[in-house]
């Protein structure tokens, strides 16, 4: 029988060939086991190298953690076993409360007296600014979840304290996952990114404003520069909307060239804007996005007689064969680097072209090799989900700057991910921004560990 206060443990760094019956002898010495479950991928059924363990008694869990956590390395593993409370049990987030709309004059003791009737309080802290002035909010941590819930039920919205603008707010404090998501949203807002859905399905109104609104041109530059959040078709739409001289990796605004075709309608409804071959040829040679260079534009162009929808909603109509240096193919070549990150979007683009540009077939293999950035620009990412590949971590870290390379380390014998990777930026600021935003970020059961690669690690990346 499990005790009410039993602890659920997370067990990490276990060999993938060990199942529950193999692991039980290791843990049974500390007490009776209530439940032991190896974690497997829900799609492939593959062992993920970790497990959940619950003892019948809380004391057994504490003994196992004390004796085993980072103390013993199991056969075939490079790092010692991890034994610690599972996220849902451990961090007090289900018993820590955020209290808002306090009066500025209330102290820690005032808040403690308010919450003491509901149970034993471990912590009570009023948040203050650098000058010592109260911010009008506090954190209160109870010993149990039940006590915290009782306080919420009784106090939330129940009164308006002196000096407060509205009624008292009492709720559970944000979890680390929620804080990580908020940090990501703040980064996205600072970079001026949009929701891909909003961009695609709001394309018509964006085109309508693009003729006269310079702000839309700035937004288009940011969208193209941070195109990890878009599909290639939407990026083409941004290029038409702006018709700029150059898009550089930092989103610096370039000079518009010509006005786009007016949006006309014979039935009173908007029609998708069109892009002709002549207009595309007017777009100058360089379309450099996130540090990748495009194919230089040539003057040998065969104009197309068909309208091409570029708003990310309608697929291209198939075209008859044209000259090899068709400008649309050149623009498409500049986006080839994103097909790994967007396999679904790639399917929308590829039917438009009869054959891939020859220059892509001649790309030297050495360009695909792992490259490092300058010192202070390279970061390690640990605890990646098993299914993550190079393209996933590339997509994850592109918002923070120009990525020189992104690599997930793979076991040569099994061809399975080792659950850590390496990303190189071209400047230290981007690396620090990535660490600040992504360290501790939780993906499923994984909490990322992101840290700078130091020179001493150069010959020992593991």
UniProtKB/Swiss-Prot annotation:
Transmembrane segments: none
Pfam family, one: RRM_1
CDD domains from the UniProt entry: RRM1_CELF3_4_5_6, RRM2_CELF3_4_5_6, RRM3_CELF3_4_5_6
Biological process terms in GO annotation: mRNA splice site recognition; positive regulation of mRNA splicing, via spliceosome; regulation of alternative mRNA splicing, via spliceosome
Annotated InterPro entries: CELF3/4/5/6_RRM1 (IPR034648), Nucleotide-bd_a/b_plait_sf (IPR012677), RBD_domain_sf (IPR035979), RRM_dom (IPR000504)
GO CC list: cytoplasm; nucleus; ribonucleoprotein complex
Gene Ontology terms, MF aspect: mRNA binding
SUPFAM superfamilies: RNA-binding domain, RBD
Function in brief: RNA-binding protein that may be involved in the regulation of pre-mRNA alternative splicing.
Similarity comment: family membership: Belongs to the CELF/BRUNOL family.
Descriptive protein name: CUGBP Elav-like family member 3-A
